């Protein structure tokens, strides 16, 4: 041990011991001492030996996992805030905890960790693991599962005679340097044992379950007394009232007719497995039983203490889910959801804002087109880049991470959509127009009175927003009378039954649509505030052109400005109903997934079936300006949702 005090010899001897693979277990004093004392460092030679040991320890089911870790990758763990800086020559003691967490990730999931290393996120994932293990309640359970994954990936299985390291030993070694329950020292102890070639036992021994039951009573008697047995049976819901025995004195609690003596709470420091919920496969593995042979009567007598311990500890009882950093409390969900929905509903008043400006008829047309393209980008981007990964479970934070690869694949879907959009738009711009196509209007539009179509209401001429002489009583006939000579006829305008029905069809369709939007916003805020923000942004972007178009369509149907605004606002308020239904129902994670899946389908339908055709069919005297606005809106919407999808884990207040 004196040689370890000399500079450079300690790491070198550790490397030689790892390469020798003698199979003997040595106490990992090197890493723990380095971490606790803050003296010394790991140089390139030591790190190279450690990485070779890690690569030799793992085994994948489909063959060798291969080597993906380099010394430079390990040295980069010391400067995660400067990924482009040149590598140093040593790893300082203050980075041992991150190195240990990063090594544990590699041992438990080598393929996934290699993907993180290539993406430059190895240090970030190691820090996330350390934060996850900070909770003392989650430390034992998470470390047990981590040891199970490491044991499953181990290249060789330990023999029955081999003494292996278990979780209590790791916790004890961390406590020995004055850091009980601290994840950094525990993982450093784990890495030290890996370096020395030790094996691991992830599950407790059979004797643990018997010891747990006897630890439940507080008396000094090594045996369970009658009173304690009665308390134990009552806790299990077994047996009837205990009759006092003749030999009992009147001072006995049972003799006085009092209830059984309550059991003492389990000592949390007695064992690291007290809160571990074991599966049937785990229990059979503890007792060395074959899954194919099953449990014999003799085996049942052996494993009964394990079942009793699981019942007494309550380890498998449903635990209240604690909100994560991204999740909101119930009051915050209602507050932020209501504010977001209110902003969305205010879109219904934008028509009045445009009508107040008599010179904005041409400008309003380009504003609508810009919002239209931004809505397509926001809707498709939110559906494909944000909602679909959540629905498919690709945005998980339970240790199994898929990296950015699915995001790039989904971005390629949007790339294909954009490529064909460019092809069609350039094809229409470069080819000569049909002489019958209108050239002097801002846009061509047709009308369908048999039903509600957003494509109809979104393709509007600038004259659709001309201000009437009397704002409080103006109608669509007043707005376009100066351009429609037939409306100047002394005969009153006769509206067809279909045109008279159109306002109610539009209002009903918008009410259902806004109700679905409210459901989507509510489910998004149930998931996290980031998902709520992204969904609210997408809904807002597509509601602006929708509400403007619907307002103009209502005016075209002959309604007054006041009545058109009233119907527009009334249909928008159904979004609050959908929001509160989603929040009050308190759907679980599965329910949120289904609602978000339906919301993704709704967004794709509205974007690709309603709004994109409106963009493709619009005609204008300045087509290249429209082409520029459409591209800016599309790319802007996709960029915002892409950045949110990639970096939402790094957003915090």
Curated annotation (Swiss-Prot):
Major subcellular location class: membrane
Residues annotated to bind Zn(2+) 2: 514, 517, 543
KW Transmembrane helix (keyword) present: yes
SS bond partners: 60-65, 68-114, 164-199, 277-316
Intervals, Extracellular compartment: 27-334, 388-402, 525-532, 585-593, 645-653
Glycan attachment sites: 223, 267
Topological domains annotated Cytoplasmic: 356-366, 424-504, 560-563, 615-623
Membrane disposition: Multi-pass membrane protein
Chain intervals for the UniProt region annotation (Disordered): 239-267, 472-493
Location within or outside the cell: Cell membrane; Recycling endosome membrane; Apical cell membrane
Single GO BP term: zinc ion transmembrane transport
Superkingdom of the organism of origin: Eukaryota
Disease: Defects in SLC39A4 are the cause of bovine hereditary zinc-deficiency (BHZD); also known as lethal trait A46, Adema disease, hereditary parakeratosis, and hereditary thymus hypoplasia. BHZD is a autosomal recessive disease caused by the inability to absorb sufficient zinc. The symptoms are diarrhea, immune system dysfunction, skin lesions and death if untreated. Oral zinc supplementation allows symptom free development of calves.
Notes on the domains: The two metal binding sites M1 and M2 that are halfway through the membrane form a binuclear metal center. M1 is essential to Zn(2+) transport, while the other, M2 appears to have an auxiliary role presumably by acting as an additional transport site that can modulate the properties of the primary transport site. The binuclear metal center plays a key role in Zn(2+) sensing.
Subunit structure: Homodimer; homodimerization is mediated by the transmembrane domain.
Name of the protein: Zinc transporter ZIP4
